[in-house]
From Swiss-Prot:
Residues carrying sugar: N118, N258
Binding-site residues, Ca(2+): E183, D191, D232, S234, V235
Organism of provenance: Mus musculus (Mouse)
PROSITE patterns, sorted: CUB (PS01180), LINK_1 (PS01241), LINK_2 (PS50963)
Disulfide bond annotation, renumbered to this chain: C58-C127, C82-C103, C135-C161, C188-C210
GO biological process, alphabetically ordered: cell adhesion; fibronectin fibril organization; hyaluronan metabolic process; negative regulation of BMP signaling pathway; negative regulation of inflammatory response; negative regulation of neutrophil chemotaxis; negative regulation of osteoblast differentiation; negative regulation of osteoclast differentiation
Knockout consequences: Mutant female mice are infertile due to impaired cumulus oophorus expansion upon gonadotropin surge. Mutant mice have twice the bone mass of wild-type littermates. They show increased trabecular number and trabecular thickness.
Name of the molecule in the record: Tumor necrosis factor-inducible gene 6 protein
Source species taxonomy: Eukaryota, Metazoa, Chordata, Craniata, Vertebrata
Origin: domain of life: Eukaryota
Region of interest: Disordered: 253-275
Length: 275
C-alpha cells in the first residue's frame, strides 16, 4: 500500500511538471522560445556528427551545445526526440516524454549515454539558442496555423524542424496545407516535409512532400501527429503554411474504416489514442 501511494505521488509530480489537464499536455509555445533547445542532424542523415562537428553546427547558428539541465527543461514541456545527440561537455543522450518499446527502453526522462571518451563517435546534436528562429514546436490547441521559418519569406538553407501535435484522447487531427512551395526534385531528397501518424518520426510514416503542389488533407488515426521539415544547403523556396483542426470522434469523417482519398482528404485507419 505504501509503495502504491509513493508511486501515485511520483506520477502526479511528473504529470504536474508537464502540465497535464483533461488528458493532454498543455503547452502550445514554440520550444525554441520557451526552452531554447532544438535537435540537429547532419544533412547526410542521423548519427553523422562528431563532437567537434556538433559544436560547430550549433555555433554556426548562434547557439551552443545544450547542457543536460537545458535538455531536461525542454523535455518537461514536451520535447521528445528519439535520436541520441551530443550535449555540452561531450555528453550524449536524448529526451523521452512518452515511453515506448522501440525508443527509450520503455523509460521517460533523458536517456543518458554519459560523457563519451571518444569524441570521434558520431551522433546528432542538441543545441541551445533562446533567440533562434521559430522552427518547430509542440501544440495542444484545438486548432492552429503554423509556418516554415521566415514565411512568407523564403526559408533558410540547412533547416531541420519538428512539429508535434497532441490533442485529447479520442480526438483526431485534420491537417490542411494552405500554401506549399519547396524545392522540387523527383525523389524529394533536397527540401521536404515528412508527416508521421505518431508521436515521433520513427513510426507511422504517412508521406514525404516537396515541390509546389498542395498535398491532400490528412486525418490522423489518433490524437497525435509529427511533422518534420528539412532543407538542404543550396536552393530555397517560399515555404509553407499548414493548418490543423480537431476532428471530434463523433463526426462522420472520423469513422472512416479504410485508408482512402475522398475529395482532397486522406483518411488513415486505426485506433484513436497514441498517448
Amino acid at each position: 500500500m505504501v509503495v502504491l501511494l509513493c508511486l501515485c505521488v511520483l506520477l502526479w509530480e511528473e504529470a504536474h511538471g508537464w502540465g497535464f489537464k483533461n488528458g493532454i499536455f498543455h503547452n502550445s509555445i514554440w520550444l525554441e522560445q520557451a526552452a531554447g533547445v532544438y535537435h540537429r542532424e547532419a544533412r547526410a542523415g542521423r548519427y553523422k556528427l562528431t563532437y567537434a562537428e556538433a559544436k560547430a553546427v550549433c555555433e554556426f547558428e548562434g547557439g551552443r551545445l545544450a547542457t543536460y539541465k537545458q535538455l531536461e527543461a525542454a523535455r518537461k514541456i514536451g520535447f521528445h526526440v528519439c535520436a541520441a545527440g551530443w550535449m555540452a561537455k561531450g555528453r550524449v543522450g536524448y529526451p523521452i516524454v512518452k515511453p515506448g518499446p522501440n525508443c527509450g527502453f520503455g523509460k521517460t526522462g533523458i536517456i543518458d549515454y554519459g560523457i563519451r571518451l571518444n569524441r570521434s563517435e558520431r551522433w546528432d546534436a542538441y543545441c541551445y539558442n533562446p533567440h533562434a528562429k521559430e522552427c518547430g514546436g509542440v501544440f495542444t490547441d484545438p486548432k492552429r496555423i503554423f509556418k516554415s521559418p521566415g514565411f512568407p519569406n523564403e526559408y533558410d538553407d540547412n533547416q531541420v524542424c519538428y512539429w508535434h501535435i497532441r490533442l485529447k484522447y479520442g480526438q483526431r487531427i485534420h491537417l490542411s496545407f494552405l500554401d506549399f512551395d519547396l524545392e522540387h526534385d523527383p525523389g524529394c531528397l533536397a527540401d521536404y516535409v515528412e508527416i508521421y501518424d505518431s508521436y515521433d518520426d520513427v513510426h507511422g510514416f504517412v508521406g514525404r512532400y516537396c515541390g509546389d503542389e498542395l498535398p491532400e488533407d490528412i486525418i490522423s488515426t489518433g490524437n497525435v501527429m509529427t511533422l518534420k521539415f528539412l532543407s538542404d544547403a543550396s536552393v530555397t523556396a517560399g515555404g509553407f503554411q499548414i493548418k490543423y483542426v480537431t476532428v471530434d470522434p463523433a463526426s462522420k469523417s472520423s469513422q472512416a474504416k479504410n485508408t482512402s482519398t475522398t475529395g482532397n482528404k486522406k483518411f488513415l485507419p486505426g485506433r484513436f489514442s497514441h498517448l
